[in-house]
């Protein structure tokens, strides 16, 4: 559920940007200075779309919190669960106190209070990972997801308060991709036996796989910059990066083609050598090829919102598939009979 919700919120966040609804709610955490929810007669459909995305953040956060509590219950026992709840209560109290102090001083109370809550969540995560006797990998990944969701809420608020600064918007999207990868890693490790792991592929194959990851990262970064320079900035009055979108589109495509070639090479090699990650490489190569096709199509059609949104979601699925491939480079060490 956490993986699905993280992927969905990339789609809803993309819808906010592609419909020009980024400032549909002009304030944060309220929609307007006087109202928590949008007023249809004032904000129109843009306010509804932006507020819907904010509600989705709450859903993602609840699911992430539920995963943390479930993992702690399974692997830390009652004591670990109670400790986490005490940290949560302390974080909420500290955040409320911070808000109460910052408001009369005319400081940005909401972002500061949320930052205090984020620190409390990080502290709880560190303690949980250190004290959990088993499956610390799952505990860590669950906490990282929750930390990421809280951090994303803070970044989302800053995005609105800065008038959709294109660099912050790009960071917001990239961070969402990382959360999708973390939740994908959680699912893989959940189905993997604990204990020591050993390399399951040749050294050269692992090296090429990591180079492929670099190509994927570069492709995503230039894709974010390209979108920030194009027509979909999130609001008609918001300034873009100032870069030439046409030039960036070509630059974005170069590492994309390199990425496709590397993934195709890895896929063929994995199937010929019958290596562990071969099935997920097949998923990855199909995702990348579809991604390349959608990218070319949207460029030729003048960047229609639906295709751009599809391109954004496919990028998250490609990153998730690559994460699974990397984790399949190793396997649990066989236990001697």
Regions found by a protein language model. Give the residues of each.
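Extracytosolic (periplasmic/ER-lumenal) interhelical loops and adjacent juxtamembrane/interface segments
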Residues: 17-51, 228, 236-241
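Membrane-interfacial catalytic/cofactor-binding modules of polytopic membrane enzymes
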Residues: 217-260, 264-271
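Individual transmembrane alpha-helix segments
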Residues: 41-63, 248, 252
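Membrane-interfacial loop-to-transmembrane alpha-helix junctions, especially the N-terminal start
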Residues: 77-89, 133-146, 205-212, 275-285, ...
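Hydrophobic cores of alpha-helical transmembrane segments in multi-pass inner/ER membrane proteins
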Residues: 59-67, 113-125, 176-191, 255-265, ...
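Membrane-interface helix caps and helix-loop-helix hairpins in membrane proteins
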Residues: 100-108, 158-171, 299-306
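N-terminal signal-anchor transmembrane alpha helix
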Residues: 1-20, 215-225
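Transmembrane alpha-helices
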Residues: 70, 74-134
């Amino acid at each position: 559920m956490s993986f699905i919700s993280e992927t969905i919120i990339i789609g809803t966040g993309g819808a906010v940007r592609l419909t020009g609804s980024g400032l549909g709610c002009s304030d944060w955490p309220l929609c307007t200075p006087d109202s928590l929810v949008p007023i249809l007669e004032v904000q129109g459909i843009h306010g509804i779309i932006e507020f819907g995305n904010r509600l989705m953040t709450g859903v993602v956060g609840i699911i992430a919190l539920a995963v943390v509590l479930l993992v702690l219950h399974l692997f830390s026992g009652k004591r670990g669960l109670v400790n986490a709840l005490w940290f949560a209560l302390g974080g909420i109290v500290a955040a409320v106190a911070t808000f109460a102090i910052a408001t009369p001083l005319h400081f940005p109370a909401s972002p500061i209070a949320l930052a205090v809550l984020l620190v409390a969540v990080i502290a709880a995560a560190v303690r949980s990972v250190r004290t959990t006797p088993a499956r610390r990998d799952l505990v860590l990944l669950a906490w990282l997801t929750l930390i990421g969701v809280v951090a994303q809420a803070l970044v989302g608020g800053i995005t609105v308060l800065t008038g959709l600064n294109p660099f912050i918007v790009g960071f917001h999207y990239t961070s969402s991709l990382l959360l999708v990868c973390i939740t994908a890693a959680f699912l893989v490790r959940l189905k993997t036996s604990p204990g020591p792991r050993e390399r399951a592929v040749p050294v050269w194959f692992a090296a090429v796989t990591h180079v492929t990851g670099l190509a994927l990262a570069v492709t995503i970064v230039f894709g974010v910059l390209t979108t920030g320079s194009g027509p979909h900035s999130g609001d008609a009055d918001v300034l873009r990066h100032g870069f030439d979108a046409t030039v960036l589109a070509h630059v974005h495509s170069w590492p994309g083609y390199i990425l496709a070639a590397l993934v195709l090479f890895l896929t063929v090699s994995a199937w010929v050598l019958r290596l562990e990650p071969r099935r997920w490489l097949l998923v990855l190569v199909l995702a990348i090829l579809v991604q390349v096709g959608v990218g070319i199509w949207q460029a030729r059609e003048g960047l229609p919102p639906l295709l751009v949104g599809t391109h954004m979601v496919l990028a998250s699925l490609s990153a998730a598939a690559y994460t699974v491939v990397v984790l399949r480079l190793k396997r649990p060490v066989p236990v001697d009979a």
